[in-house]
Design a protein with these regions (language model features):
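Ligand-binding beta-strand-loop-alpha-helix segment within the catalytic cores
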Residues: 32, 36-134
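N-terminal glycine-/serine-/threonine-rich phosphate-binding loop
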Residues: 1-22
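Glycine-rich phosphate/pyrophosphate-binding loops
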Residues: 162-180, 233-236
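Long, charged amphipathic helices and adjacent flexible linkers at domain junctions
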Residues: 249-262
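Structural motif
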Residues: 1, 22, 102, 132-136, ...
Length: 262
């Protein structure tokens, strides 16, 4: 919760500088925690959660709880700063429709979904009103069926549809190292800038990503976004205080930026 409040303060500051923000939250740790409490195993395939009815209930509960926590974090303003008392207006809604993942390689993903459509006009109108748009990975099909999507899939799809200037992932990993897979050291620091061609070449060398700590997990989404017109995609560590501000406003940044240098 403390980290959420700090990130909310950074986002409030960035928005006050005139940046239009769409925030997509995840809920993977919360769902896994609930499943564990119920004695139910978390199952994945192809890097996607297999969402049975128990996992779907957990996802719905986590989505609701996180929305309240995020709205609370943004309602606290910035004490002891010139922005004390300033509130960020947050609007969330059914800006997305979902479709089922279906069956892949004989695996039935049940209630796991992908983005079917993004209401870009609705999101743009909301941003133009000066509000921050909050999106959840819990979404519905045109027939009202509930689906559990991944935060990465939602964020990437929305960034592409909006043709956003940046796609930023706040992640468990610090970024991508010069020598991926090798231990962190002075000789193997974070690669702060990765041209799109180099990122694509690296993806081909890596094994398919299955979990968020795999090097290629966020990189594949960064590459997808850059190929589709989003000029810059970033992988940042959420544990580092001020990571967003450092990445956006300091020349060398702090995580890894994938850039399309066209």
């Amino acid at each position: 919760a403390g980290k959420l409040h700090a990130i909310a303060q950074d986002l409030a500051l960035i928005q006050a500088m005139g940046v239009k923000l769409v925030l997509v939250h995840g809920f993977r740790p919360q769902v896994n925690e609930q499943l564990q409490a119920k004695g139910h195993e978390a199952r994945y395939s192809h890097g996607i959660r297999i969402t049975d009815s128990v996992a779907l209930d957990c996802a719905q509960e986590a989505a609701g709880q996180l929305r309240y926590e995020i709205e609370a974090a943004f309602s606290q303003g910035l004490p002891n700063t010139p922005m004390a008392g300033a509130t960020v207006r947050i609007i969330s809604g059914n800006f997305l429709t979902a479709r089922p993942v279906g069956i892949m390689d004989g695996v039935d993903f049940q209630h796991s979904g992908l983005v079917r459509k993004v209401d870009t006009a609705g999101i743009t109108r909301t941003l133009d009103m000066g509000a921050l748009v909050l999106l959840s990975p819990f979404n519905y099909s045109p027939t009202g069926e509930a689906f559990n999507l991944s935060m990465e899939e939602v964020a990437t799809s929305v960034a592409i549809e909006l043709q956003a200037d940046k796609l930023i992932f706040m992640t468990e990993v610090p970024g991508i190292r010069i020598q991926p897979g090798e231990p962190a050291s002075d000789d193997n620091p974070i690669d702060t800038e990765l041209p799109l061609a180099a990122a694509q070449a690296l993806l081909k060398q890596l094994p398919p990503a299955q979990v968020p700590t795999d090097t290629g997990f966020y990189l594949q989404h960064c590459v997808k976004a850059c190929k589709a017109g989003v000029e810059r995609s970033h992988i940042l560590p959420f544990k580092t205080d001020g990571a967003l501000l450092l990445e956006i406003y300091v020349h060398d940044g702090i995580g890894t930026m994938v850039i399309d240098e066209k």
